[in-house]
Amino acid sequence: MKRSTEEAVRRRRSFFLLASTSGCAALALAWSCSQPTPRSEPPTPPPAPEPSSLSAESLDVLDDEAEISVELEATLDEWFGDLFEPRYVVLPEWREAGFDPNTSPFEGARAFEGIDEADLETIRAGNREHWSSVLNAIDRNANRLPGPWPGRRDLNQTWRDVRLNRNAVGPADFKREARRLFEEDFPTSADTARLYARNCQQCHGMTGAGDGPMSNMMEPRPRDYRHGVFKFSSVSSPARPRRDDLRRTLEHGLPGTQMASWRERLGMGEREALIDRVRWIAIRGEVERWLVASWIADEEPPSEAIEDAYRTIWSRWLTADDYFVALQDDVPPADAASIERGNALFHDATRGNCASCHGDGGRGDGPNAVEVTPDGVRHPLLRDEWGRPAWPRDLRNGVFRGGSRPIDIYRRVHCGVHGTPMPAQGDTLTQDEIWDLVHYVRSIAGLEPE
């Protein structure tokens, strides 16, 4: 199942060059490499070592285990492909159920994960909007048709083939095939890798570690997808986010951060494919961490532990709907009585206990989370899963990264904020009590009742 080492090395280096080198720098590099080396110069040094696809944490833990590191990387490549052409091993039970996550949903093999015909029609509608100028040119039977598009090598090749066949099939068949290509656009895994490199890696990094070249200038820093932990979702643990959760982030961004909306910049099929890409990074990262832990605990080789890890991690994504926190009834009115009850819960150390971190009145300066020195300097006392300072939200400013709708804040209280000290209260507070907290929080944020 693996490519030759030589081919993998060649493709990995070329892809990192694509992602990290500007066009002018690449031309300068190509020109300088084409010039003869003066005889007086020393010999060219050997090429830099091939960058590992393993995380820095794994390499650090396995620093004295070179053979295991090699086996781990080879095992992950066998089950996940690589950064440039990701793929999954299809388990027997998936094949029996007609599920293949490597395919476009329009090929009919993704219903197992909950992508139904209604979802497909939604993608078609979004694609029609995004590709409207192309579809209009097709409908007009224009002589000059749009294309190519950056980062869409596979789409460009298919589009060339369709155009070359234009006269052979006739106008009606050409129009039907051409429209279908764009209405059902869903990038291949390789095209999605290129889309990610063009649009995401500057912040999130090529491996999804949140270490892109822009990341050090950002607060908060970009998400490290490889932990499989996503702060803002509509599910309780141990599930991973639903597609709707990741879709909402791509479409609306995260207020108060540098994560912008991609709704106007990418087509719906492209956004859906990037959801697949983020999921691939997360599942591969979680499996890698599992395999390293298995080796450290029991010296179980990666090649023997992989199937159990793979199946377990995947199940957390496929069963997300089972942990979905749905809105059971209409949102109760945000009247004065509800807000007052929410205020009491917020400050009650035995019930809501929100003020212990968010502070009196929601100022984000609670004694359990922030230490304030006599000269007024604030120091965080809490850390998130990634080891970074966890500052409680100042609720008065009305900026809620996971959304400011009543249901968004309800889910933050019910499910917590995954990967942070913000706990889930769904098992300790009643539904009515959570709504009282929601109404109180929205009132101090100055948000109008909905």
Language-model-detected regions and their locations in the chain:
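Bacterial signal peptide processing site
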Residues: 34-36
